[in-house]
């Protein structure tokens, strides 16, 4: 099986739903065979590792540890979903205090154990803020740390698919701006619908202004909607898009 690279990828928070799905997604996408799973909760972590091994991914070298030093040492790429998840009735910002402390420690661990890491992705909410905190404490360059950014854009695409009843392939360049939270901005300026600018359709019979406002609100509340439906925060979509 040909992988994109053979460099070490460490997944922090691997015993959680996002982390475990990221591990499987990385192997299914053939990103790298060398995956290290880290989580402080050892029993669940071992369970995830066993499941990954039982998948029988060809050429995979899956290791797991509850020692953060061992997990990060030698890592070229790190993805962390190691924060608390949002629950019903919470905003992403409600997670800030606890997850900010986790992000600060994560940044320090990166500085201490893998200062030569190539790239780090921070997934836990509020992702824009926890990513910035990680960056500040890690000493890495801004280009080396990113956060989950594509999910809000795909949520916009999905809402437009449902509204116009056309395939996703006919909706291009969906973009959202600002933080991954309640104050995000949803713009129409770059999006095209079957080759036509979305901005030219807003206010017409095809997309009345009131309908566009409703679509934007659905995008902003996309995560809350998943919690309302499933009783837990999103994990499959952020795991895939990270």
Predicted feature locations:
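Conserved N-terminal Rossmann-fold NAD(P) cofactor-binding segment
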Residues: 6, 31-75, 84, 90
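Conserved glycine-rich cofactor-binding loop
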Residues: 15
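N-terminal Rossmann-fold NAD(P) dinucleotide-binding loop
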Residues: 19-20
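Conserved S-adenosyl-L-methionine
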Residues: 28-34, 139-142
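C-terminal substrate-binding/catalytic lobe of Rossmann-fold NAD(P)-dependent dehydrogenases
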Residues: 138-143, 152-242
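Rossmann-like NAD(P)(H) cofactor-binding subdomain of soluble oxidoreductases
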Residues: 91-159
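Generic hydrophobic/aromatic pocket-lining and core-packing "Φ" positions
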Residues: 23-24, 107
């Amino acid at each position: 099986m040909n992988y994109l690279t053979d460099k070490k990828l460490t997944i922090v928070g691997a015993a959680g739903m996002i982390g475990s799905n990221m591990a499987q997604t990385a192997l299914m996408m053939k990103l790298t065979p060398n995956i290290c799973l880290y989580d402080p909760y050892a029993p669940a972590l071992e369970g995830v590792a066993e499941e990954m091994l039982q998948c029988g991914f060809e050429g995979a070298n899956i290791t797991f540890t509850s020692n953060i030093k061992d997990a990060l040492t030698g890592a070229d790429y790190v993805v962390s979903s190691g924060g608390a998840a949002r629950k019903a009735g919470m905003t992403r910002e409600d997670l800030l205090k606890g997850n900010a402390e986790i992000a600060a420690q994560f940044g320090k661990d990166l500085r201490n154990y893998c200062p030569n890491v190539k790239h780090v992705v921070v997934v836990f909410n509020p992702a824009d803020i926890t990513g910035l905190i990680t960056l500040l404490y890690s000493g890495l360059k801004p280009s080396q740390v990113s956060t989950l950014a594509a999910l809000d854009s795909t949520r916009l695409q999905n809402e437009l698919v449902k509204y116009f009843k056309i395939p996703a392939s006919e909706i291009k360049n969906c973009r959202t701006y600002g933080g991954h939270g309640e104050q995000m901005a949803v713009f129409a300026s770059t999006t095209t619908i079957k080759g036509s600018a979305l901005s030219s359709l807003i206010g017409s019979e095809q997309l009345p202004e009131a309908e566009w406002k409703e679509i934007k609100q659905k995008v902003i509340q996309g995560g809350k909607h998943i919690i309302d439906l499933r009783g837990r925060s999103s994990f499959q979509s952020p795991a895939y898009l990270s």
